[in-house]
Amino acid sequence: VAQAALTYLLFKEEINPYILLIEGTATMLLYNFGFMLSKPADPQASAYARTRWVFSHEYLLWFTIIACVGLLAFAVFHVHMATLGYLAFVGLVSVSYSLPFMRYKGKRGGLRMLPGVKLFHIALVWTLSTTGLPLVELIAAGHAIDWYLAWYHAGLRFLFLLLCTLPFDIRDIRQDAYYHLKTLATLLGKERASTLCYLIVFLHTALLLVAPYAMELKVGLVLANLLLLLLLRLLIFKNKVHYHYVYLLDYA
């Protein structure tokens, strides 16, 4: 939601609350549907506490789904048809990760079967959502868009989302290996994946410095990168016991 709001600020447009409501509810729905589609046959026999806890409180998933459907239905009546079509496209791209629509090595499944695709798929979906959705609604409402700024912003957003997502993959290396899910982190190993995080921080910061953004926004985004770098270096990758500190990236 915050990233979608930032898109409006970068383009110096008034924030559309209905787009933010769609962003929030659609994200919650996709996460919850992802959980349901990946539900093991016997969740309580899982080796992972997170899986056992989630499905021992499955009623919370359904409550959230019902609430989000209601709020989403309210919001979609306040945006243009072109925006709804684009939202449906983003939703289709998102669920393609879990839905068994393809075959790979003789097995039917979704994009999650392809080695290393998870990280890039998440970053793509979030970029399409937090950058593309506000812009599509602005275009449908008759606003002129600076396409150089749009593509530059989309590229930076994709890099930033890679940076924010990779530490979660590093945290989940053991669990993903247990489920035979070949993420970029499992393919590279923890040390090389951690190094890649630092490289993305520096690349993203360098591109920010020459970005066609207002100076105050540029300074704020560079400071956010500095905070991310400190979190990665001093807390997230350093602490092996409390690896749930990776969730601090959400606040950064």
Where are these regions (language model features)?
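Interhelical loop and helix-boundary elements at the membrane-water interface
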Residues: 1, 40-64, 98-124, 183-193, ...
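Alpha-helical membrane-inserting segments
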Residues: 3, 7, 11, 30-37, ...
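Transmembrane helix-loop-helix
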Residues: 15-19, 61-104, 198-243
